């Protein structure tokens, strides 16, 4: 009885410690120590239970010894294990099972004991709990044992591991591996097995067929220079989503689009079955005659469909033109002439002429116009075919810049509302006016004393001046010794030359100065000569200094 208890506790210890070792909780040294302590405790318990041998003997072959090591791991005795053959040198097999409800359950069976130098088996069984692929089983060989063989065959790695790969393991399927090892010395041989698997997910794809249809609506007739609008309707009448739906509408010959493009492209993206989209396209007719607008729809993997509408463009109803100077100087009046005509064969009614001036423009005169801020308005009840009228507007700009005069004419006729527009742009130039002032700071002075000539250069005009140059010449009584200014300079004898100033802005002032020493008595003179791109003739200014 004592031997039986000791064996049972030994099985419990080895099973539990092996489970913890396999899960990575214990290291080898700790596992061996734990096993020794548990076996010693088993000997003590066996002595205490001697008095109950007879009662326990009857239940000897039916008792299950189960010990919970961790919440996920359970060690059980395999009651159906086959007795070892007489020529084998290992005991009955017992099983360690990982109760894992995820992908793959792994079961490992090893003998209760083995003989040093004689091989014993390690059985590993992987059970699929769901469909998995790329199942990898790794077996850590015992530290003090020699690998003999395995089924399926494999080769140990450098760190003493055996690795098997199962391409696919279905739910409920089993895969068994047997490893034979030979212990090399006495002690506990610990072995660990791990499994890694990828769940296999199967999906169903519903296939359908998109069917994109396109229709177009537009007027049968229109007037020249009056907007013509088309409606393009796109609908998916199929059973699947149409991907990357694109509508292309080339601008027909005789039409113009506000964007200036010759091909209009509309990206509709994906369209679900039954989904409908509407695109509105507006053109301006440029000539009379029949014009056909064609819209083409395409989508990923499908055929292109087209829809077209033909429109007859009638004679023009109204025309407007505006003329004015291309450029002028600031504050100088400029006259614009606005011409409105009816080149068609229909009477125009309720004609409105609107002239919109750019900000910065001031109206000097506009006969017959209603003036509101920067807008001028003329109205006519009728404009007969072939009739033409002119309106004159006198304006001026207060600041330099480019300003545009926009004219729009709106009218009604039997063919609908007719409009026409025109514009004229005038560049208003400023005028540079560069002046110079020369003064000396000390006058009179004694021989040996210094004085400073200051030269202020100012652009009083409305435009910038460029390449502004300054030269100073002094009589023999004054000797230049230093200078300062916005540009570099050089002293040569009694002359100081400053480098050209690239730009002098409107209303801008710069100052030059030259320090001079009185070298002899007399009535000295200093002459400043100023030149620039706008000064056709250089400007000079003279200052005198008395020296005694």
From Swiss-Prot:
Signal peptide as annotated in the record: 1-22
Sequence segments annotated as region (Disordered): 45-65
Superkingdom of the source species: Bacteria
GO molecular function, one term: extracellular matrix structural constituent
InterPro entries xrefs: Chlam_OMP6, Chlamydia_OmcB, DUF11_rpt, Ig-like_fold, OmcB-like_DUF11
Compositional bias segments (type: Basic residues): 54-63
GO annotations of cellular component type: periplasmic space
Keywords: Cell shape, Disulfide bond, Periplasm, Signal
Disulfide bonds: none
Pfam (any one): Chlam_OMP6
Subcellular localization(s) per the UniProt record: Periplasm
Propeptide regions on this chain: 23-40
GO biological process: regulation of cell shape
Main location: periplasm
Function as written in the Swiss-Prot or TrEMBL entry: In elementary bodies (EBs, the infectious stage, which is able to survive outside the host cell) provides the structural integrity of the outer envelope through disulfide cross-links with the small cysteine-rich protein and the major outer membrane porin. It has been described in publications as the Sarkosyl-insoluble COMC (Chlamydia outer membrane complex), and serves as the functional equivalent of peptidoglycan. It is present but the disulfide bonds are reduced in reticulate bodies (RBs).
Record's subunit section: Part of a disulfide cross-linked outer membrane complex (COMC) composed of the major outer membrane porin (MOMP), the small cysteine-rich protein (OmcA) and the large cysteine-rich periplasmic protein (OmcB).
NCBIfam families noted in UniProt: B_ant_repeat (TIGR01451)
Protein name, entry field: Large cysteine-rich periplasmic protein OmcB
Organism name: Chlamydia muridarum (strain MoPn / Nigg)
Lineage start: Bacteria, Pseudomonadati, Chlamydiota, Chlamydiia, Chlamydiales
Gene: omcB
């Amino acid at each position: 009885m004592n031997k039986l208890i000791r064996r049972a506790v030994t099985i419990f210890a080895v099973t539990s410690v092996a489970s913890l070792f396999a899960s990575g909780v214990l290291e080898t040294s700790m596992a061996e120590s734990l096993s020794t302590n548990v076996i010693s405790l088993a000997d003590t318990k066996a002595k205490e239970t001697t008095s109950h041998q007879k009662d326990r003997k009857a239940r000897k072959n039916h008792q299950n010894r189960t010990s919970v090591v961790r919440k996920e791991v359970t060690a059980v005795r395999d009651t159906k294990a086959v007795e070892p053959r007489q020529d084998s040198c290992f005991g009955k097999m017992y099983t360690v099972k990982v109760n894992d409800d995820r992908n793959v359950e792994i079961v490992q069976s090893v003998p209760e004991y083995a003989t040093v130098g004689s091989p014993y088996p390690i059985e590993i069984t992987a059970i699929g709990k769901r469909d998995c692929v790329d199942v990898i089983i790794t077996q850590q060989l015992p530290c003090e044992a020699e690998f003999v063989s395995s089924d399926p065959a494999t080769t140990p790695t450098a760190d003493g591991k055996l690795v098997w790969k199962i391409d696919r393991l279905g739910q409920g399927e089993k895969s068994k591996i047997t490893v034979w090892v030979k212990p090399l010395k006495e002690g506990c041989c610990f072995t660990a097995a791990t499994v890694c698997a990828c769940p296999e997910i199967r999906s169903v794809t519903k296939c359908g067929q998109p069917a994109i249809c396109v229709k177009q609506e537009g007027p049968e007739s229109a007037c020249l220079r009056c907007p013509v609008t088309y409606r393009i309707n796109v609908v998916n009448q199929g059973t699947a989503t149409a991907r990357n739906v694109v509508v292309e509408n080339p601008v027909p010959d005789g039409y113009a689009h506000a964007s200036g493009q010759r091909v209009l492209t509309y990206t509709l993206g994906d369209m679900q079955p039954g989904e409908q989209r509407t695109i509105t396209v507006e053109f301006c007719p440029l000539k009379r005659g029949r014009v056909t607008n064609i819209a083409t729809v395409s989508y990923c993997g499908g055929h292109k469909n087209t829809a077209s509408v033909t429109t007859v463009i009638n004679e023009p109803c109204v025309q407007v033109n505006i003329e004015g100077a291309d450029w002028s100087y600031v504050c100088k009046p400029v006259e614009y002439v606005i011409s409105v005509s009816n080149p068609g064969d229909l009477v125009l009614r309720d004609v409105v002429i609107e002239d919109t001036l750019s900000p910065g423009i001031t109206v000097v005169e506009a006969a017959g116009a209603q003036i509101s801020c920067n807008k001028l308005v003329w109205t006519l009840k009728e404009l007969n075919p072939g009739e033409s009228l002119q309106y004159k507007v006198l304006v001026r700009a207060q600041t330099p810049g480019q300003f545009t005069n926009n004219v729009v004419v709106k009218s009604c006729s039997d063919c609908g509302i007719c409009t026409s527009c025109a514009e004229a742009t005038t560049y208003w130039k400023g005028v540079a006016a560069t002046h110079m002032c020369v003064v000396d700071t000390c006058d009179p002075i004694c021989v040996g004393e210094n004085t400073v000539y200051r030269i202020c250069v100012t652009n009083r005009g409305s435009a910038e001046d460029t390449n502004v140059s300054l030269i100073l010449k002094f009589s023999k009584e004054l000797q230049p010794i230093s200078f300062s200014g916005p540009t570099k300079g050089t002293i040569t004898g009694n002359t100081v030359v400053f480098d050209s100033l690239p730009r002098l802005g409107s209303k801008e002032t710069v100052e030059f100065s030259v320090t001079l020493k009185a070298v002899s008595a007399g009535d000295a003179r200093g002459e400043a000569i100023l030149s620039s791109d706008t000064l056709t003739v250089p400007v000079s200014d003279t200052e005198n200094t008395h020296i005694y």
